[in-house]
Amino acid sequence: MNLLLLNGPNLNLLGKREPSIYGSQSLESIEISLSQRAKEEGVGLECFQSNSEGTLVDYIHQSIGKVDAILINAGAYTHTSIALRDALLSAEIPYVELHLSNTYARETFRQKSLLADRAIGVVSGFGVMSYQLAFQGILDYLRNRSKE
């Protein structure tokens, strides 16, 4: 089983950017922790971050047939990117949307997701634990699906 963790714009600044909202851990430390967890579960995990919408779309396209599911923190693209939504849907790869902060408790423009309605699930508001919860959720989903 192989998973892809995609992180969108500004997430490369985690630990420095608004730590009162996004926490003090770096993206690298989150990826290391999740990679260790994946290894313990016998799951492959590839991590990728880009500030560019087109690069994220290309990466999703390149993942077709290579990954079983995607964990995606699309950052601000969650609220604006029809291209990212279309890439996820056309790839036909199950995905979980995740966010560090509770986007529904923030500004109105952050309360709309263009990805959520087609996601397997959405995890939001648990800080860095959102990554672990999303990982566990998609892992359970894939394992249960394979039993059917």
UniProtKB/Swiss-Prot annotation:
Reactions catalysed: 3-dehydroquinate = 3-dehydroshikimate + H2O
CDD domains membership: DHQase_II
Active-site positions on this chain: Y22, H99
Known pathway: Metabolic intermediate biosynthesis; chorismate biosynthesis; chorismate from D-erythrose 4-phosphate and phosphoenolpyruvate: step 3/7
Domain of life: Bacteria
Transmembrane segment boundaries: none
Alphabetical GO biological process terms: amino acid biosynthetic process; aromatic amino acid family biosynthetic process; chorismate biosynthetic process; quinate catabolic process
One example GO MF annotation: 3-dehydroquinate dehydratase activity
Enzyme Commission (EC) number: 4.2.1.10
Keyword tags: Amino-acid biosynthesis, Aromatic amino acid biosynthesis, Lyase
UniProt key word Lyase: yes
Entries under Pfam families matching the protein: DHquinase_II
Binding-site list for substrate: N73, H79, D86, L100, S101, R110
Keyword Nucleotide-binding: no
Positions bearing the site annotation: Transition state stabilizer: R17
HAMAP family: AroQ (MF_00169)
Quaternary data: Homododecamer.
Family stated for the protein in its record: Belongs to the type-II 3-dehydroquinase family.
Known role: Catalyzes a trans-dehydration via an enolate intermediate.
Record NCBIfam families: aroQ, PRK05395.1-1, PRK05395.1-2, PRK05395.1-3, PRK05395.1-4
Protein name in the entry: 3-dehydroquinate dehydratase
